[in-house]
């Protein structure tokens, strides 16, 4: 088993495949003469966990930069960001390659996740939808709303043309379902004074600044409505679109199934046991949201 360290690992849950890298192997013994081999690893994005490094790019697009890094590391990636324009200048400073990609996703409010086989940068095309019904595939279901939306405004100075641009959030929900819209409106009713912030990316005109504050507010409030659940459906993964139904008891032996909406899975934990035992725990956001919550990076 010593030769397993650093090798590719393919895990098949009978419907979902996860590709990763074994980073640690150990022998575990307890209470007898027998023992177990314990393998620890990460997704293939571990190959982007270089030591802290520095680099810079001029007049390159986000796609160009991310593809360059993933290609060098040998990481399969689906790169299609909404930000298409070339960037005047972008710098990686004392960061791992993965942390730098996370920061780019945060700066430009782009989608970023690992679907089990590919690093996805940019909102993916909608795939097939899986129907999940509470009481059938779903054993636990929680539907939640929270007050996340805040008004924001700020400015950005462009030194080349000596211009200061001012902008603010539109304070309108985009892509939220009924529950998310209600939570968004309630939050803005609570927080009426705009926070003053600076734009993280380089801004060259007022249109870019307005778009930045719009997408930042969308990202900050993306989880205004979310669900968590437990299921035995083996085909689920991060990025899966699910149509969630719940059955309402209307009489003796009578149940009416209603859809509470379509969601995209953003977190999932797979638990596979002995034999055919399997269960997963997931969190999902409305599938129509334009951006994900920001990665927690500086």
Sequence positions of predicted segments:
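Amphipathic alpha-helical and helix-coil boundary elements used as assembly
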Residues: 1-298
């Amino acid at each position: 088993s010593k030769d397993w360290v650093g090798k590719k690992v393919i895990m098949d849950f009978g419907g979902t495949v996860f590709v990763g890298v074994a980073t640690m192997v150990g022998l575990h013994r307890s209470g007898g003469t027998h023992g177990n081999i314990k393998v620890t690893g990460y997704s293939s994005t571990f190959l982007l966990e270089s030591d802290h490094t520095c680099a810079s790019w001029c007049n390159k697009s986000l796609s160009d930069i991310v593809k360059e890094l993933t290609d060098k590391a040998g990481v399969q990636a689906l790169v299609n960001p909404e930000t298409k324009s070339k960037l005047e200048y972008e710098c990686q400073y004392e960061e791992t390659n993965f942390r730098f990609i996370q920061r780019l996703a945060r700066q430009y409010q782009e989608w970023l996740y690992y679907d089990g086989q590919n690093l996805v940068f940019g909102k993916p095309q909608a795939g097939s939808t899986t129907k999940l019904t509470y009481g059938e595939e779903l054993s636990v279901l929680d539907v939640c709303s929270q007050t996340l939306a805040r008004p924001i405004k700020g400015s950005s100075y462009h030194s080349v043309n000596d211009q200061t641009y001012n902008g603010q959030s539109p304070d309108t929900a985009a892509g939220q379902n009924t529950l998310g819209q209600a939570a968004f409106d309630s939050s803005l009713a609570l927080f009426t004074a705009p926070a003053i912030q600076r734009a993280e990316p380089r801004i060259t005109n007022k249109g870019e600044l307005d778009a930045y504050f719009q997408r930042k507010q969308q990202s900050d409030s993306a989880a205004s409505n979310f669900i968590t659940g437990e299921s035995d459906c083996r085909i689920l993964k991060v990025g899966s679109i699910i149509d969630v139904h719940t059955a309402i008891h209307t009489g003796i032996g009578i149940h009416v199934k209603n859809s509470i909406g379509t969601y995209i899975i953003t977190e999932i934990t797979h638990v596979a046991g002995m034999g055919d035992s399997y269960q997963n725990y997931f969190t999902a956001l409305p599938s129509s949201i334009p951006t994900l919550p920001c990665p927690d990076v500086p």
